[in-house]
A protein has these predicted regions:
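Short, glycine-/aromatic-enriched active-site segment of Class I SAM-dependent methyltransferases
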Residues: 122-125, 140-154
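Class I SAM-dependent methyltransferase Rossmann-like catalytic core
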Residues: 1-20
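Conserved SAM-binding loop
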Residues: 19, 23-117, 190-191
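Short hydrophobic/aromatic beta-strand or adjacent loop that forms the aromatic wall/cage
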Residues: 158, 182-189
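Active-site phosphate/pyrophosphate- and oxyanion-stabilizing loops and adjacent acidic/basic residues
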Residues: 13, 94, 98, 164
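Conserved class I S-adenosyl-L-methionine
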Residues: 106-137
């Protein structure tokens, strides 16, 4: 989707220069199509619950971000873009954060802000501010842009994370607020 591509390009404008010294990168919960947008394709391993049929020539490992099958410090960078909010419970989010800090010598973890009026998962304004019980598959299918594009029921599996909670999950890390039109669009956690 062009809007998502615009924000990804903007977010990753300085990524390559900031992390060019990282020869091994673990992308937790990501997809291979993100990396050509960033401008990097070498030394990347993707960890996902399921491995897609089309791997795009990238190395995938099947596993959970809450229990990673790698040694401590196995990667120069543990990277995650919009995945930590999908692991379920707050307890799982803390496990995910802990595992990123364990396997990566440096980390980069981005998650969207609930305060932004457009939910990037739905590509629709304001619905994510409703009580979760209202976000039925039927509502998500017929009243969201993603529902119209995908034409299938959608299960809303997002557990939003505040900046304050991120500080607890990632002690000692920097947290930057990415803004659009002065509004907090997402939070980016970095270390190293």
């Amino acid at each position: 989707m062009p809007v998502r591509r615009f924000f990804r390009k903007r977010r990753f404008k300085n990524f390559v220069s900031d992390y060019e010294c990282c020869t091994t990168i673990l992308d937790v919960g990501g997809q291979h199509y993100t990396w050509p947008i960033i401008g990097r394709v070498d030394g990347i391993t993707l960890l996902n619950i399921s491995v897609p049929q089309d791997t795009g020539g990238f190395q995938y490992v099947q596993g959970s971000g809450c229990e990673m099958p790698f040694a401590d410090g196995a990667f120069d960078l543990a990277f995650s873009n919009s995945a930590i909010e999908h692991v379920g419970s707050v307890e799982n989010q803390f496990k995910f954060a802990s595992e990123m800090m364990r396997v990566g010598k440096r980390i980069y973890c981005q998650t969207p802000s609930r305060l932004f009026p457009v939910d990037p998962h739905l590509t629709t304004p304001f619905l994510h501010w409703l009580p979760i019980s209202w976000l039925t598959p039927r509502l998500l299918r017929y009243f969201t842009l993603n529902g119209w594009l995908w034409k299938k029921p959608y299960e809303y599996d997002v557990t939003w994370i505040s900046k304050r909670k991120l500080k607890k999950m990632f002690p000692g890390c920097k947290i930057k607020t990415e803004r659009f039109l002065l509004l907090p669009k997402s939070f980016i956690v970095t270390s190293g």
